[in-house]
């Protein structure tokens, strides 16, 4: 999965990531697409790097909202979505 695909899948999440509130169903669909496409360690590390880059590039993202997003969508991502995450530690 490319960073462009990760960003495309998360485009509907920007409002929630910035302001909180209700997570749109289309956002959760994107989150689940990313998770389902991350089958190998290399995939998970690549997605992590893309998420880190996106978190740093989009203005106004609330770190607490980013951390809460997987749970709000009913999925478990085995690492924290944060600009400080060490993607190389992901298996």
Swiss-Prot record:
PROSITE patterns in the cross-refs: PLANT_LTP (PS00597)
Cysteine pairs bridged by disulfides in the record: 3-50, 13-27, 28-73, 48-87
Entry superkingdom: Eukaryota
Keywords: Antibiotic, Antimicrobial, Disulfide bond, Fungicide, Lipid-binding, Transport
Binding site for a 1,2-diacyl-sn-glycero-3-phosphocholine: 44, 79
Gene Ontology biological-process entries: defense response to fungus; defense response to Gram-positive bacterium; killing of cells of another organism; lipid transport
Family matches, as InterPro entries: Bifun_inhib/LTP/seed_sf, Bifunc_inhib/LTP/seed_store, Plant_nsLTP
Molecular-function annotations in GO: lipid binding
UniProt-listed SMART domains: AAI
One matching Pfam family: Tryp_alpha_amyl
Function: Plant non-specific lipid-transfer proteins transfer phospholipids as well as galactolipids across membranes. May play a role in wax or cutin deposition in the cell walls of expanding epidermal cells and certain secretory tissues. Has antifungal activity against F.solani, F.oxysporum, P.aphanidermatum and S.rolfsii. Has antibacterial activity against the Gram-positive bacterium S.aureus but not against the Gram-negative bacterium S.typhimurium.
Complexes and interactors: Monomer.
Family designation: Belongs to the plant LTP family.
UniProt name for this protein: Non-specific lipid-transfer protein 1
Organism per entry: Vigna radiata var. radiata
């Amino acid at each position: 999965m490319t960073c462009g695909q990760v960003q495309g899948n998360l485009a509907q999440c920007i409002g929630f990531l910035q302001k909180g509130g209700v997570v749109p169903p289309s956002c959760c669909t994107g989150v689940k697409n990313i998770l389902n496409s991350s089958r190998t360690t290399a995939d998970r590390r690549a997605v992590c790097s893309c998420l880190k880059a996106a978190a740093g590039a989009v203005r106004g993202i609330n770190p607490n909202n980013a951390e809460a997003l997987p749970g709000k969508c009913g999925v478990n991502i085995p690492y924290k979505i944060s600009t400080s995450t060490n993607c190389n530690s992901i298996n």
